[in-house]
Amino acid sequence: MKKHIFEDIILQNALNFTEEVVEIFGDLLNKGMNITELVARIKELTDKLGRGAIEAIIEELDRIIKEDKRRKEKWVVERKDKKRLTTVLGDIEYERTYYKSKEDGRYTYLVDDALEIGRHDRIEKGVKIKLVENAIEESYERSSKKACPEELSKQTVLNAIREIGEVEVKREIKEKKEVRGLYIEADEDHVPLQDGRDETPRLVYIHEGREEKNGRNVLKNVYYKAYVGEKPEDIWIDVANYIEDNYKEEKIEKIYIAGDGAPWIKEGLKWILKSRFVLDRYHLNKYVLKATSKEPKYRDKIWRAINEGDKEGVKKVFDELIKAAEEEREKEKIKEAKKYILNNWEGIKIYSEDEDVIGCSAEGHISHVFSARLSRNPLGWSREGLKLMAKLRVFSKNGGDLREVEWGKKKNINAGSYKLTKKQIKEAVRRVKTSTNEKINNITVLNIGKVTPIYRVLRALKYAQVI
């Protein structure tokens, strides 16, 4: 870039933008367009303006670095190279200078280092964040189409997810909380993998009970955790660590672990102090319905015995059901339901013994947090992709912001290669302001002679004509 033409480029882009806005306005009046079409036209125009501004700014920064005396003492100019980068505004292309260090002989693009652009980067971080944010809610293909104007592949989305890695919201803890009771709910999803097998991502969430917000019952201070492939003991050690980090354990009187009674969920009773199991009534009801599908008259009897905490009464009703069943297959179904209910009896009778028990909403949460993205449609995940997405889903539910996540250190950036001094920054801003103001004062579109849309608008304004 020639000396100090940065201001010329910026001003020319601004003039072009103004002229094109006038053209769009003319199309609106002459041809007509709806608000959606108008917004699309203006967005395309502002994206174009933004790309031009970014290219000009980067090349101006490159020029400032090149002319700096400090740079000349440490870095030797090798050549200039072009760089193409996909941004949220579309593709940009700029020229920057390649340098060799006088001290250790390494090579780098100082302006790229200053802007944290990696040597092999083809997509800027903002695009990657949008790709991942979109992918949390919808398919890789749809995500790639929404992130930026350029066409990106599904593999690009997966690469961005891999680059971010396993993310987790770390809550700032100023002081551990005091609560009488804690509630832990757990469930799992069943997700088909690309190799034909299934994986079971597990969801565990910890909360302090329910509270009313805007006329709805919501979980109080809920925190979600996702696990894919971890052993049950590792899951519960992690949950125990969360409780220890966030709560004064000596003040907790009761902890309820609620779920469908799966062994991995009951494993939590060994690791979480003061914990008791609570059976999810959704699954309890499912087995009652299953046992009484052919003899619904027994349904009320079973529920009466359950609600009274009468274990022997439950056994008696099931024995009657088994005798009444005519087919062996039906008998086995009833026996299975009986076994399930009796094996989880401690988690059933607690409802009648402890007024602080609030039940379990894990089935709804697993559907909303996991199934809606992971298993509702036949996607065929890789194990790696599934684990990363499960972590991202709970990251989002916990209020996480990918812009606040510290990504892995870039191996292709020479940290500290170059940094502008305050004096350089102040001088550059002063020069650009002064030069730009002078150029604006010298713009006389009305005297150019060429009748353009911007000429007509300015002339109309000057002579108070109606367009």
From Swiss-Prot:
Protein name, UniProt field: UPF0236 protein TTE0298
Family membership noted in the UniProt record: Belongs to the UPF0236 family.
Pfam families to which the protein is assigned, alphabetical: UPF0236 (PF06782)
InterPro entries, A to Z: UPF0236
